[in-house]
Amino acid sequence: MVAQPKGKSAILEKHDDDVVIVAALRSPMTRGKKGGLSQCCPEEMLGQVLKGVVAQSKIDPKLIDDIAVGNVLPPGGGATVARMAALWAGIPNTTALNTLNRQCSSGLAATNQIANEIKTGQIDIGIGAGVESMTQNYGAGVMPEKMSDAVMENEEASDCLAPMGITSENVAAEYNITRDVQDQFAAESYQKAAAAQKAGKFKSEIVTIKYEDEDGNERVIDTDDGIREGVTKESLSKLKPAFSKTGSTTAGNASQVSDGAAAVLLARRSVAKKLGLPIIGKFVQAAVVGVPPRVMGIGPAFAIPRVLELTGLSNDDIDIFEINEAFASQAVYSVQKAGIDPKKVNPVGGAIAMGHPLGCTGARQIATGLAEAKRENKKLIVTSMCIGTGMGMASVIVNEQ
């Protein structure tokens, strides 16, 4: 195995065997049940984003070797919908595809799978993607009716079934993350996202989605519709706890139930150069760690140091941290525990304001991070998220735009 280059100067060097990012795009993130994509089937949503990365990169679809799609709530048997999306997008049947589910990191796990296939010489070009229609597939029905009594006697095993909101309350209680601090963090997420949207900052990363709704009308969706203007800590403080009468997690300081898709087109640098493909970034490394299921939200606090250790980088080397805001409680704790400068975190807002389509988020963060890095002339990006059942994942990406 080739040794991973370590340290900032080594990471920024360019080599023919690097895994580079050729395109990274997403759909709008829209509200579950009532947002712009609530009547759009996930295969059509994902298919249009796949078309977007192919069109932007100008790649011949026949050259795409493999596609991995993150999807947590699989409709139609999981792989079926994603395969349909790729074929409909004009990608030939000779291109392989799989879906995977590592909960909230599925989009990043898919991207990492493709990156590793390129690193090991299995393929030259591939797409890591993610899609979720929480409108269609989220709810009580996704949980099994019967679980093994023997397994449920194990405390940590049974904790895997804890509602995510309860795990947020556990984090807040165990690590003393107050309601006031959570509401302040959430308000800032909304404020940053609203300012970014008003300035048109998301346009370059969004693929407009067109589809026919249930009434036969054509819908054209080109904007995130969960972002709200005028949100303050004071307005959020009026909301009631959502999961426990005495709790601190509310609908206002937790991520939104959303619909969306994202895709990242990756290639070996030598191949991208030979084909004249645009190179916008480099996928350096990813890391995944386990944490107690009852406080699953603390995952980024341990995944980020791990990926920095693997790459020989420090917090000071990183310009942008895209940390998923599943809940304000866990995001605040993770930033504090990992010793990250809050000013570097989610500069254009996060999932509290924009939404968290489960399988999509890991790929969406890459698109958002690279777009922001290009605007601000920044180099190093870390993306990270907590993962249901107790894990965290993180990646290091170089902006080359």
Give residue ranges: language-model regions:
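N-terminal extracellular/periplasmic Venus flytrap/periplasmic-binding protein-like
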Residues: 2, 8-20, 25-28, 38-48, ...
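Active-site pocket-shaping loop/turn-to-helix segments
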Residues: 9-11, 27-51, 55, 73-75, ...
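Phosphate/pyrophosphate-binding loops at sites that engage ATP/ADP/AMP, CoA/4′-phosphopantetheine
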Residues: 52-65, 171, 175-176, 272-279, ...
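Conserved catalytic cysteine-centered active-site region
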Residues: 71-125, 159-166, 230-256, 337-365, ...
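Condensing-enzyme catalytic core of the thiolase-fold
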Residues: 194-195, 263-285, 302-311, 326-340, ...
